[in-house]
From Swiss-Prot:
Activity as a function of temperature: Optimum temperature is 30 degrees Celsius.
Function: Reductase involved in lignan biosynthesis. Catalyzes the enantioselective sequential conversion of (+)-pinoresinol into (+)-lariciresinol and of (+)-lariciresinol into (-)-secoisolariciresinol. Abstracts the 4R-hydride from the NADPH cofactor during catalysis.
EC number: 1.23.1.2, 1.23.1.1
Designated gene of the protein: PLR_Fi1
The protein's name: Bifunctional pinoresinol-lariciresinol reductase
Gene Ontology molecular function, alphabetical: lariciresinol reductase activity; pinoresinol reductase activity
Tissues expressing this chain: Expressed in young stems, young roots and petioles. In stems, expressed in radial parenchyma cells and in the cambial cells of developing secondary xylem.
Protein species of origin: Forsythia intermedia
Quaternary structure and interacting proteins, as annotated: Dimer.
Length: 312
């Protein structure tokens, strides 16, 4: 497949910076939207300069200046948005509606990847827990705008980010694995799908000029990474040579604890409920033509066990 000109929005963020690296690594001419809102955030500025030194182009543009967005979009074939959808950080999913309008105005984009990268909102609109459902609702608003505008798209469903889920052994609010005890959600046997964020970026970039992924949802669900919480914990125990004390948290007690939290945390915990208590991520079948590790067998993805080794 040929190389593309790729514009990445949110290129200094948690996933965005990985998308930039993956785009450069795969040989695409990579542009990063440099927003004035970055201000004097020296870490982000230094990251942008680092990417520039690696060959990326910095393009000035702002969601407050529609024409600047249009001009930035006109430079490329592919637009990827990595705008944050996490309420405990900055939640800006609907900001992408301006980007959709800019892409429509420019008229030259061959593929748009909006900020998805989690669970597929189309699959869980009727079952997602409130208030976490707001994230899915907003992603569907963006999807409908994309499709109404006739913009070629790929939606990437990446399931669970390893850094957030595996690092804390699937416990909310923990990003380092314990060597003493672990809270098990329910019976701990609901399976979920965990992906290294670098792998997510690699797969996402693979899709951008692949005709097989045009106007489709692609799921990153590699077989070795479909595990229950208990299986994740067992993998960790094997690595450290020690069995953890296990404390069971019932669904009822979990829901009661959620009510005591601030709204942003309630949103995040709603997603944990859907994943850990409902098993939503493995509640439907995925065809080989929709699954990233089947589409791109040349990518050596990081297994759960390999990922957890960094914490030993």
């Amino acid at each position: 497949m040929g190389k593309s000109k790729v514009l990445i929005i949110g290129g200094t963020g948690y996933l965005g910076r990985r998308l930039v690296k993956a785009s450069l690594a795969q040989g695409h001419e990579t542009y990063i939207l440099h927003r004035p809102e970055i201000g004097v955030d020296i870490d982000k500025v230094e990251m942008l300069i680092s990417f520039k030194m690696q060959g990326a182009h910095l393009v000035s543009g702002s969601f407050k200046d529609f024409n600047s967005l249009v001009e930035a979009v006109k430079l490329v074939d592919v637009v990827i948005s990595a705008i944050s959808g996490v309420h405990i950080r900055s939640h800006q999913i609907l900001l992408q509606l301006k980007l959709v309008e800019a892409i429509k105005e420019a008229g030259n984009v061959k593929r748009f990847l909006p900020s998805e990268f989690g669970m597929d909102p189309a699959k869980f609109m009727d079952t997602a827990m409130e208030p976490g459902k707001v994230t899915l609702d907003e992603k569907m608003v963006v999807r409908k705008a994309i499709e109404k505008a006739g913009i070629p798209f790929t939606y990437v469903s990446a399931n669970c980010f390893a850094g957030y889920f595996l690092g804390g052994l699937c416990q909310f609010g923990k990003i380092l694995p314990s060597r003493d005890f672990v809270i098990i959600h329910g019976d701990g046997n609901k399976k979920a799908i965990y992906n290294n964020e670098d792998d997510i970026a690699t797969y996402a970039i693979k899709t951008i000029n692949d005709p097989r992924t045009l106007n489709k949802t692609i799921y990153i669900s590699p077989p070795k990474n479909i595990l229950s919480q208990r299986e994740v914990v067992q993998t960790w125990e094997k690595l450290i040579g020690k069995e953890l004390q296990k404390i069971t948290l019932s669904k009822e007690d979990f829901l009661a604890s959620v009510k005591e939290l601030e709204y942003a945390q309630q949103v995040g915990l709603s997603h944990y409920h859907d994943v850990n208590y409902q098993g939503c991520l493995t509640s439907f079948e995925i065809g080989d033509e929709e699954e990233a590790s089947k589409l791109y067998p040349e990518v050596k993805y990081t297994s759960v066990e390999e990922y957890l080794k960094r914490y030993v």
